[in-house]
């Protein structure tokens, strides 16, 4: 027995990850970081811990053990009313009891010492529960126990500590322990009392060193919103989301491969009301429409995330993706890490097979092809069922197995019915909200952050929830038929041929990267432009001259961007970058845009810049557009995007592909424009690129589509200026045989 085993109080610098049995997973991790990582520049606010021994001492001295044992004798967690009754009785008994004086005295002294350390009369603190089996792989305890923010004053700290201890017996915590096979009395609860970061005046969020949807391990995922972090953790807001690519970040590149702006309607701040120390307020329209973090802050957090992951990986002797909470002090503008724990959902999955779900709505009547609700997809599955709208937690017992839960947000109190739902839809929240985390753990589809599900759906309505299409989650009216196909990737044979993939949506790239491959043979820019940009490039280049109605529509799409051209470049670069990152360091062949005039016309503002052609298949398309004065500036934006991917993201594995190039002379004109924009064939950019074993060589390569008979007849001339061909069999067949593929 160590000298720490019988302590009521331990400080962060006295504990490490070896002390989970004494202080719980969350507090052990805080101690580990505070002791080992603050010296590396990672800021962690200080604090002290009321130990698990103190909890056990309190329960025993207050005579609560026999009462709890008696309450649990006829516990039935499948009976929600029974569960609620038992949990409430135990919690009330704990809160009514007095904390022993010997523990109170030590808490009081420690709180005074913490306040003095920060030169405050009474420090504002975060009081967090930490169970002794918490945050172990296989047991996420996602929000099962309580956190109290802006706890100020000795008396309030006493009360918060006691309520945190009582939260070991929350309904969801009891249910979770039963589901996971934990013995109730083998788990104790410690309480961390940590100096608050003034993120109420700044911002906060969560960070994962793994993609939370696919389990792809080479990215850092960061969510950010204004105010205190509980809004993000509880899923009460749709936050900004950022992705940073680890391998090239480690090489020194500012590799932010994705930035998406969230709605961030509300934030949590300090309140002057002593009974309610925090309150929710609306975020100003200006702050809703800007990114919470700048690039420097995103990169700082990502580097900290890598350092923390590296430390925990070395300590565990195996890969240890991490789940962290961060906060930015609005007074000092400093960033802090306030929690870190192992990620317990995706990191535990084995990627031996890929189940592909697909839903084809094209054969439905015209009125039913469009989704009735759209939000952020969680998972990749499809489910049908009857809607059950629940707003009040007291109505949970009315929910029936197989129904689809529709609500504003979820918190751990909802987990008993989430376990029996076929799908979940929420008005608010992002990919790291409570609803999203639990849905992934349960393996059911969810659509979060819809904004209008409660007004669009009705209880009893039959719907189909589709999360199989990347980041967008779609909800359709009625029960629709879908396909499900399982691919066992362990049985795929080794091949001598370099088998590359065709990738459409960047959002699916991380998942498909688990299939054995040698890179990407074709990634089309058109998919990125249609799904992420939606606006004709010339409309963005000529934004100021557009009519007011069109400008208003474009403003909604380009939130966060004053310069509309930057929006086009950034979103195109992000789409290319995600695909490049997913298959790095293997080659990823990206084809410049090959919309025909009728397809370009469907983009917002497109009709003003596209001619009407009788046969667009043979018209103004491919390379002929790129040097035409009417489109040349738009093509330069594509070049800027590709340059950004290679030189800023560090993804030198990107290969350019020119479509529908009729003559070598036309090809040379395109190459000249690319060179003007800093994309010179054979160039490597500002840093060395090590070609992988499966790469087709080093240096910036430019291929051309072989899809016109002239490409075949003049192949040697084309290969004098290009590095290779990609055969486009559809167009080559129609132009050779005189058939129209659109007829």
Ranges and model annotations:
Residues 1-192, 289-294, 301, 309-313, ...:
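N-terminal beta-alpha lobe that positions the nucleotide/phosphoryl donor
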Residues 72-75, 85-86, 107, 178-183, ...:
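Long, charged amphipathic helices and adjacent flexible linkers at domain junctions
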Residues 122-126, 131-141, 148, 186, ...:
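Conserved alpha/beta-domain cores
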Residues 142-175, 202-273, 338-372, 420-427, ...:
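Extended active-site and interfacial segments that coordinate phosphate-rich ligands
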Residues 143, 317-344:
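Conserved metal-phosphate-binding beta-hairpin within the catalytic cores
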Residues 150-188, 281-308, 313, 334, ...:
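Amphipathic alpha-helical
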Residues 219-323, 327-330, 362-384, 392, ...:
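Conserved catalytic alpha/beta cores of large enzymes that bind or transform nucleotide phosphates
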Residues 343-347, 372-404, 408-523, 527-544:
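Acidic, glycine-rich flexible loop/linker segments
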């Amino acid at each position: 027995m160590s000298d720490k085993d019988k302590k009521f109080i331990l400080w962060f610098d006295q504990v490490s990850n070896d002390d989970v049995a004494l202080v719980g997973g969350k507090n052990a991790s805080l101690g580990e970081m505070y002791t080992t990582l603050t010296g590396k520049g990672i800021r962690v606010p200080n604090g002290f811990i009321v130990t698990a021994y103190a909890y056990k001492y309190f329960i025993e001295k207050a005579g609560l053990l026999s009462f709890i044992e008696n309450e649990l004798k006829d516990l039935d967690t499948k009976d929600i009313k029974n569960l609620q009754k038992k949990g409430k009785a135990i919690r009330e008994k704990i809160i009514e009891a007095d904390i022993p004086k010997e523990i109170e005295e030590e808490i009081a002294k420690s709180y005074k010492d913490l306040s003095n350390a920060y030169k405050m009369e009474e420090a504002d603190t975060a009081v967090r529960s930490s169970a002794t089996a918490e945050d172990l792989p296989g047991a996420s305890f996602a929000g099962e126990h309580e956190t109290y923010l802006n706890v100020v004053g000795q008396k309030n700290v006493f009360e918060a500590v006691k309520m945190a201890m009582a939260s070991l017996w929350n309904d969801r915590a009891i249910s979770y322990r039963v589901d996971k096979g934990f013995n109730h009395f083998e788990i104790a609860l410690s309480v961390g009392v940590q100096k608050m970061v003034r993120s109420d005046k700044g911002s906060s969020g969560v960070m994962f060193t793994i993609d939370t949807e696919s389990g792809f391990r080479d990215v850092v995922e960061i969510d950010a919103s204004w105010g205190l972090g509980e809004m993000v953790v509880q899923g009460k807001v749709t936050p900004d989301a950022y992705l940073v690519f680890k391998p090239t970040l480690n090489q020194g590149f500012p590799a932010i491969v994705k930035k998406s702006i969230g709605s961030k309607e509300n934030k949590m701040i300090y309140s002057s009301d002593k009974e309610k120390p925090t309150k929710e307020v609306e975020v100003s329209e200006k702050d809703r429409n800007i990114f919470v973090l700048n690039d420097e802050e995103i990169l700082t957090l990502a580097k900290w995330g890598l350092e923390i992951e590296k430390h925990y990986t070395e300590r565990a002797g195996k890969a240890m993706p991490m789940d962290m909470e961060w906060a930015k002090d609005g007074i000092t503008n400093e960033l802090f890490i306030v929690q870190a724990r192992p990620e317990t959902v995706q990191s535990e999955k084995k990627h031996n097979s890929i189940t592909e779900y697909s839903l084809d709505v094209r054969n439905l009547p015209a009125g039913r092809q469009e989704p009735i609700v759209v939000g952020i997809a969680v998972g990749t599955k499809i489910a049908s069922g009857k809607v059950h709208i629940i707003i009040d937690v007291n109505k949970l017992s009315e929910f029936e197995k197989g129904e689809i839960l529709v609500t504003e947000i979820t918190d751990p109190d909802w987990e008993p019915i989430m376990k029996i739902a076929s799908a979940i839809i929420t008005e608010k929240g992002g990919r790291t909200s409570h609803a999203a985390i639990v849905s992934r753990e349960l393996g059911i589809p969810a659509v979060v952050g819809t904004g209008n599900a409660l007004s669009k759906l009705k209880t009893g309505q039959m719907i189909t929830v589709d999360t199989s299409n990347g980041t967008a989650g779609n909800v359709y009216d009625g029960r629709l038929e879908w396909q499900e196909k399982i691919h066992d990737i362990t049985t795929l044979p080794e091949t001598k041929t370099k088998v590359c993939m065709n990738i459409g949506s960047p959002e699916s790239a991380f998942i498909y990267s688990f299939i054995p491959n040698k890179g990407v043979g074709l990634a089309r820019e058109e998919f990125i432009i249609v799904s992420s940009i939606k606006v004709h490039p010339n409309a963005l280049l000529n934004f100021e001259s557009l009519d007011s109605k069109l400008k208003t529509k474009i403003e909604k799409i380009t939130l966060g961007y004053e310069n509309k051209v930057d929006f086009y470049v950034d979103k195109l670069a992000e789409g290319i970058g995600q695909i490049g990152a997913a298959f790095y360091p293997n080659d990823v062949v990206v084809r410049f845009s090959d919309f025909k005039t009728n397809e370009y016309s469907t983009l917002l503002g497109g009709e003003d810049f596209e001619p009407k052609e009788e046969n667009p298949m043979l018209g103004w398309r491919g390379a002929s557009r790129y040097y035409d004065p009417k489109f040349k500036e738009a093509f330069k934006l594509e070049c800027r995007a590709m340059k950004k991917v290679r030189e800023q993201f560090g993804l030198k594995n990107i290969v350019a592909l020119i479509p529908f190039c009729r003559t070598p002379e036309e090809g040379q004109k395109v190459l000249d424009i690319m060179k003007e924009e800093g994309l010179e064939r054979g160039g490597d950019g500002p840093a060395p690129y090590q070609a992988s074993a499966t790469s087709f060589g080093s240096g910036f390569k430019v291929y051309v589509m072989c899809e016109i008979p002239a490409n075949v007849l003049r192949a040697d001339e084309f290969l004098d200026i290009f590095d290779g061909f990609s055969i486009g069999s559809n167009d080559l067949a129609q132009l050779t045989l005189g058939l129209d593929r659109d007829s």
